Structures are given as C-alpha cells and as structure tokens.
C-alpha cells in the first residue's frame, strides 16, 4: 500500500476544511430562506381611513381562529375600552371582552384607559400596550384555536379583571378556577373556556356583577401578573 506523505496529508486537511466552510455558508443561506414571512406583516397599516372603515390592529396568525384587536374607534383614538378574546368579523363584532383594571371603579361604569402609541407593539404573533390610567402592561399571543393574555400590574392598587356581560350565558367561575361563558349572535352561539393563572390564585377571587359588568377581584391578594 502506498503511504501518504506529510505534504499530501496537509493538502487533504486544507481541502476538507474548505469543504466544511463552504457547506456552512450554504447552510446559513438555507436557514435564511426559511424565515417566516409573517415577520414582515405590519397590523398597524390602514389604521386610519378618510372615507371607509379603517382596518384594525389585528393580532391574527394565518389560517387560525383567534383574532384579537384592542377596542377603539381607530388608530387615532386615544382610549381603549376592552380586549376581546376573539372577533366574528374581520373588523367588528367583538366576543368575550375583558379589561384589566387597578383600583376600584363605581358600579355600572365600564372601564376605559388612555394608551401610548409609541409604546404599543403589534405583530401577527404578539401584541403589547400600556394602559396609562391603570398602569398595566397588556400582552397577548394568539395560537390556532386559543390565545394567551398577560396583565402586568405596575402599582399596588387592587387587582380587578373586568368581564363585559355576555349576550348568552353569563360568565361563570367554576370550582377548578376556570371561566366559562357563551355569546349568541345571528342565530349562532360561541363558547369560551378560560384558565386564569393557577387555582390557588383564582380561588381567592370572586365574580361580582352589576347591571352591565362582571368583575373578578383579587381583593388584598395582589399578584403582579395575571394570565
């Protein structure tokens, strides 16, 4: 068998290293081509319409059931009244509206808060905004058939979660800490099932109702985050 001298071995190693480097460069290019085009979608485009209805800041993954946007007239509106768990049309008719609130509100008064356009983040896969009146940061992430809200309370006021009264079966707090309810519209019925944090937190909350609102209040228990 013919032996390989030192010079030939060195050349082989160089060729191998060049091949590995070339493969690594090509691999990086392949990874770059797999970037999801959703990252280029800006939900804020079309938020102001001079003549027709504006588009909404919709947080919605392609081909998914959950569509959320903050309830306000359009992008110029400086106040938010609630966040729906989903919508039944592309720009209206919200379902299962909720709103985090810090501190106490008078009975029969729906919450409303100013927001800061410069602090809002909106992508099809993630949303975040700051409620100035309540000092709460709201985060939302959609999935195909569900969504996750996270409410970050920044002050030491009482933690409340406003639940807009439903057109069907009202909100019900189950013994396992889950929330259920239904909405009726155009001869159809939508259902909601929600879990809030963990049982040891939600079991300390109660649902209070007035003529237009339902509330979950944590009283003296003040978790920094509720989701």
Model-derived segments and spans:
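Accessory carbohydrate-recognition regions in carbohydrate-active enzymes
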Residues: 30-227
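N-terminal secretory signal peptides that target proteins for export/translocation
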Residues: 1-10
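A generic "functional-site adjacency" signal
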Residues: 4-5, 19, 145
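Sec-dependent signal peptide recognition
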Residues: 9-18
